[in-house]
Amino acid sequence: MDNLFTFLHEIEDRYARTIFNFHLISCDEIGDIYGLMKERISSEDMFDNIVYNKDIHPAIKKLVYCDIQLTKHIINQNTYPVFNDSSQVKCCHYFDINSNNSNISSRTVEIFESEKSSLVSYIKTTNKKRKVNYGEIKKTVHGGTNANYFSGKKSDEYLSTTVRSNINQPWIKTISKRMRVDIINHSIVTRGKSSILQTIEIIFTNRTCVKIFKDSTMHIILSKDKDEKGCINMIDKLFYVYYNLFLLFEDIIQNDYFKEVANVVNHVLMATALDEKLFLIKKMAEHDVYGVSNFKIGMFNLTFIKSLDHTVFPSLLDEDSKIKFFKGKKLNIVALRSLEDCTNYVTKSENMIEMMKERSTILNSIDIETESVDRLKELLLK
């Protein structure tokens, strides 16, 4: 981890990170994080009864548990603004909301109707304006006009699906769904699967998302703010997430190890100089501290922050290159999966930029109208 941050610091005058996600590999000695969090979230409907430590409340926006039988959101109401009618997302026609109408539940209903939650994304995705049923096309081909075509309503206690078709093309379906949602206090509950993955998610107020899988491996998607400047800000954001995450684990799992790790993490946050932060991170790696010793890069992108004032020559890019140009002028390096990957493509990017500058200078010095076609091909296509 310290070597990655050291390199990102070395190039931060030219490159800034955009997407950055990573994994914390499961360790047997820390216990069943997934199982204990699942048990706590499943049995409670008040945020305070899950997250006891009030010091970390401002950092955590939402907890989500999703498996095949149940999807449950627990929201921290204090982290949401007061919504007005003009800010509401028009999603009511996707849901039947059941609530006990208490003040707490009514506020949760207001939040649910106003924010773009994963339930909204899921139900919008599963509502298909047009879908071809290829099985019914085969029936038409092989069975003639007597083939049966389904249209109508299918439903269970929590999901109603309406399938409509055109009489002239009955194999083309329009599918609409409505989902029942139960809202009690801080909890938003629906039955059945509402995600591809079975995970527990912790959504932070800074938009960082932590996904915990069944084996307690974690996937962390680190958010990026416009005011993030350089590697030191990135380290502070990551370790701020660590600090609050580990105190949450100590809260739920009752394992003092996480409190000890949170204290070590806090030393990194309190350090003011980058060199001191990197030194402390290196020491954490040497002592096999959770969060550093089991850190594994998932994928990250870099963007070249300086302006490209010369002509861009796409022909210099390999077909499978991770160097991409956005809108012709913005250079991005995408899908980097290791420090070696990063250093390799940054070097390629630097060399390519120099070559483009040289070609651009030549191109600007010649008369395009009189120059030979072969010479122009050499500049533009090779």
Curated annotation (Swiss-Prot):
It holds the Pfam family Pox_int_trans. Keywords: Activator, Early protein, Phosphoprotein, Transcription, Transcription regulation. Induction: Expressed in the early phase of the viral replicative cycle. The keyword Transcription regulation applies. InterPro entries: Poxvirus_intermed-TF. Belongs to the orthopoxvirus OPG150 family. Acts with RNA polymerase to initiate transcription from intermediate gene promoters. Heterodimerizes with protein A8 to form the virus intermediate transcription factor (VITF)-3. This is Intermediate transcription factor 3 large subunit. It comes from Monkeypox virus. The gene is OPG150.
